[in-house]
Each structure stands twice: as C-alpha cells, then as structure tokens.
C-alpha cells in the first residue's frame, strides 16, 4: 500500500517509533528491521533528554551496524532519518581514513566536519529570524547611496517604494561594501596531502580584523547587485556568532548522526595476506574506537564531546564478516541489522510508490517540455525484470540499477523531447523490450552500459 503523509497527534517527545517508520515508508521500500532499529535509536534520544540528574549523562546511544549489499537503502534510511529530525548528518566512507601517523585524513575530521554542518544549520536558522530586519537595513544603505543620508524622510519613502518595486534595479550606484579579499598572501598545498593547504597569513590584517576594523571598499554596481551583497552583510551583523557556535556544538553533541559507509573495507579478512594493508586497516579501526565510545575532539569552534553522537556504520561484508572487525569495535556497534537484497516486487514498488519515485522524477523532467510520459503496468514489470536480471548476472548494485536502465530506456525521448511538445508518449513492455533487449542479452555489453 502506498505510504502517504499523515498529520500526527502532538507528542511531547516528538515522533513515536511507529510514526518515524511511517515517515520513512514514504521514501524507502521494505527493510522494516532497519527502519525499526533507527526509529528506536531516535526515540531513545528523546527519552534520554527527559531523564533527570546524573543518570542522563550515563545513557549513551546504541550505535548501529547495517549489513547489506549496495543499493538496498542503507544510506537512504540514515539520510532520511536526519532530515526528519533536522539533525546534523555527516556521511563518510571508512576507506577515506588512514591510521594516525600515515598520510591521509584522520578520523577526528569526522567530528570537525559534523560541527561545521551544525554551525551552518544554526546560522541558516538564525538568519531566517532576522531576515526582515536585515533587508530593512540593506535598503537604508541603498537609499543613502541614492539620495544621500541627509535627504528628507518624504524623499526616502518615495525612493524606498521604487527600490521595493524593482523600478531602480538597473540603476548604478556607488556604495561601500565589505572587503572580502582573503587574509594573507595566498596558500600552498601541503606535500603528500591532496586537498589540504596552508595559508600565508598577513599579521597586520589579522590584528586589524580582530580589533573590529574590518576593511571596506567603495564599488560601483547596480542596485539589484548591491542588494545581493548587502543583505548577507547585514545578516552577519545581526546574528550572534558566539551564541550560534554554542548552540551548534550542543546540537552536534546531542543530535548529530554520523554514517560511516564501507566499514567492511577496513575489516581484516583472515584469508587476506597483505600485512602492510592489514596494519593500516586495523589502525583506522583503533582510531575509530574512542570516537564511537566517547571522547573530546578539538575543533576550531571549541571542544566537542562525542559521547551522545549516534554512529551508524554500514557495509556489504561480501568478503570480510562483521566478526572480522576488532572485537572492541564490534562491542561499540551493539545493534546489528541485516538488510534484504531487493526482489522483483521491491523493484516495482521502488519505481512506483515513494513520493519521489524514479518514474515520477522522469515524468516531471520530460513534462517540463510539455510532453506527457505514461508507463503501463507491464512496462514497469519489464523494467524491474531487467534490473533483477542484470544484478544477478553482472553485479548486484540494488536499486541503483534502475537509474542506469531508465537512462538508457529514455535516452532518445530525453534527446528529442524539445521537438515533441504537446505529445503523449506511452511506455509499454514492447517499447522496453525494443530499447533494452539487445543490451540485456549481451552480458559483455551490459557490463559497460547498464
């Protein structure tokens, strides 16, 4: 049955586990055990916040290990859960990290990135609260440039109305704006660490800005361009940066969700003989231990405790097994959830049922060209059939196979849609077979195309 959006009875602790599962059902097909596990984990967070006294600090989240092939919904469940609660969410592959002392990223960067996301979330929220005030101040600065600071209130009102109506959008003005040039004299990449850089700082600029003497420069620009620059400037002035940082740290510590994908890739399979690789993998696992158990990480915003951050790890575990992880790490991921491989019925449901299903997405895209796309039930079944066949014969990538199949199926229509305005195109099983049968039957070709 198709999941629909429901208005729930207000609960003082937020959504109940059943309501969370129902919300996830709107976007994700099947995997009830995984949905139930994350729903309980989320509800327990709310329960913990209502526990009195010192006991609250002793209650830690039960971290989750999801086991299942790629494309079965592991990442999507965690991502939708974070959206549902407006929690800071950070996804990273375990293979991105190396043991401390080796070249590469260290695991503490997970928390630094999570806090950065939390700060941006809090900043966006704070800006919406002062948006009207910031716009008013921006308009006043525009008026100062247009009619001067000493102009009469009557003149300012007339020009203000014109600014609001957009009549003066293309009028050129001269206005002072913040100098956004970076502090210092450029940067250089740190050898052996791609993507990282070290800046050369200008001490005079730094001291000047620290004392509040931020630089401005006068520029000529159109009114509409000035508004786009000045509003963000005024927003930054109105929000309390220190308060935002404190709220962001609290948000990350109590509501943060970290999703570590491909954790099976750092497990040490007994059959593998590469000793150097094993040392590095085991080192990453050991570095993850304190982070998941609870430690304090230094960030540019201050110290962040990881005790109550929810960690969700996932992996396919085709070669290694969960028992190949370090025993200590296994103990810190007490909830194990195995996700099922997708069946033909699951594929059909994925194509049709979610609110943002692939069929709805493609129909909406082609619909922008005034072309009506319609899929018959037999066509949907055929697409699901082909997806399962290729997954079995080539490699099982789960629901992601549907993306490649639909792209190939609709390639000609997408290319020609702009010349087909007003037309209705019906995709039936015969159309699907004509477009894809040659590729499906030639497995060597399917490996490269699908």
UniProtKB/Swiss-Prot annotation:
GO-annotated cellular components: HslUV protease complex
UniProt key word Secreted: no
BP-aspect Gene Ontology terms: protein unfolding; proteolysis involved in protein catabolic process
Binding residue positions for ATP: 29, 71-76, 261, 328, 400
GO molecular function terms attached to this record: ATP binding; ATP hydrolysis activity; peptidase activity; proteasome-activating activity
Signal peptide: none
Summary of subunit composition and partner proteins: A double ring-shaped homohexamer of HslV is capped on each side by a ring-shaped HslU homohexamer. The assembly of the HslU/HslV complex is dependent on binding of ATP.
Functional description taken from the UniProt entry: ATPase subunit of a proteasome-like degradation complex; this subunit has chaperone activity. The binding of ATP and its subsequent hydrolysis by HslU are essential for unfolding of protein substrates subsequently hydrolyzed by HslV. HslU recognizes the N-terminal part of its protein substrates and unfolds these before they are guided to HslV for hydrolysis.
Name of the featured protein: ATP-dependent protease ATPase subunit HslU
Organism: Rickettsia canadensis (strain McKiel)
Gene, per the UniProt record: hslU
